Amino acid sequence: MAAEGAVILTGGSTGIGAATAKALAKAGREIINLDIKEAPQEASAHFHCDLADPSSIDSVLGKLEGTFASLLNVAGVPGTVDKDTVVGVNTLGLRHLTDGIWDQIADKGTVVNVASVAGNQWKNVSPYIPSFSTPRIMLRA
């Protein structure tokens, strides 16, 4: 049985995250969106959060109160942006947020980390963007 309560969603403003927000809303879930972009209409609450910036994450963590059903780490940036941003958002920020919210996830709650096929097949998919592939491989560990 799924835990009750709000779902924290990173990257819910665009792409896969926005599709996830729509599906969660359709299922009647309360969504707290963390993103650098504007809030999707499905979000019950929205916090501007730059996952490449630990102080931005800490600021949001200080505002999140209570227990949450799930943390869905969907936010990500492509390997075409600078390597520090790729690693910061796709791996280090995800870990920082997860570590910071861990004690607020319900006993039967879930943490889901969305990664790319590049973490499995990086030699075939992205040999020219190792800064993208490597963080995705790290998520598998």
Which residues does each predicted region cover?
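Active-site Tyr-X3-Lys motif and surrounding loop/helix of classical short-chain dehydrogenase/reductase
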Residues: 59, 82-88
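Conserved N-terminal Rossmann-fold NAD(P)-binding element of oxidoreductases
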Residues: 6-12, 34
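Rossmann-fold cofactor-recognition segment
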Residues: 41-57
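Conserved glycine-rich Rossmann-like NAD(P)H-binding loop of the short-chain dehydrogenase/reductase
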Residues: 26-41
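Flexible cofactor-recognition loop at the NAD(P)H-binding site
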Residues: 14, 66, 70-80, 94, ...
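N-terminal Rossmann NAD(P)H-binding glycine-rich loop of SDR-like oxidoreductase domains
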Residues: 10-24
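Catalytic loop of short-chain dehydrogenase/reductase
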Residues: 78-79, 83-84, 103, 107-141
